[in-house]
Amino acid sequence: MLDRALGEPPAQIHPVAWFGRIMTLAERAGYRDTRTAGAIHAALGAALGVGAGAALRSTTAATALATAGRSLGTAALGVAEVLDRGDLAGARARLPALVGRDPAGLGAAEIARAVVESVAENTVDAVVAPAFWAACCGAPGALGYRAVNTMDSMVGHRSARYRRYGWASARLDDVAGYVPARLTAALTAAARPSRGGAIWRAVRTQAPGHPSPNAGVAEAAFAAALGLRLGGRNSYDGRAEVRAALGDGRPARAADIPRAVRLSRDVSLLLAGLLAAAAAGSAGPAAGARR
């Protein structure tokens, strides 16, 4: 909830930005085109994140630093605003803040799809997963997860440079996000109960066709909840990927971006309520025992 109220610190002082700079230096010093070198990189980054959480000690502060739901919504709505004005060039210019695909040549529908998919995936990465790991492991869990996810975004690509070096970071992120992605699908179904059956069908039958074991779950859940059809052809660094269709609805359009942001916020609120109830439940017996 602190993230919703205050947002993230400026990039110049944000600890995650500093972590990214440190890992860039580590890559320059230790890069080899091998999985072993990449595993060392991943282990170093994870250790830094966990260590930072242990030093910080405050789970609340660590969770606020690891969460980026407000900035996600702001970036997504910014694209929607320029799309509504018919400014395709402006929308393409804003897109790299949300997705890694090539924006050149994308039409309005493809830009809208990219943003909705990003909101779905980042609801896991930037909202649910940090809170989940904070609940499980405290401050080390929150910042350790954020470190893992940041490394995946930096080196977990299928490009020639990172196919081997980024393998360990990508797999570590897959493991760390596995449960949070499925929790996100459950919360999405709870937030849109009239679409619950369609959401679980999409997660069960369509998500396995996505190359990511976690992003596919979130995107399938959001597609079904919003009555959209996501997936299709994407281009990354000039390399085309054709992804399985997710959802059985219509193509996305600009007006669906605010709907996706509202859904992400509803998921966040449900998660906050769930965690508050769990905390109250665990505190209750202990308080009774003291009496």
Which residues does each PLM region occupy?
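Short amphipathic, positively biased membrane-proximal segments
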Residues: 1-291
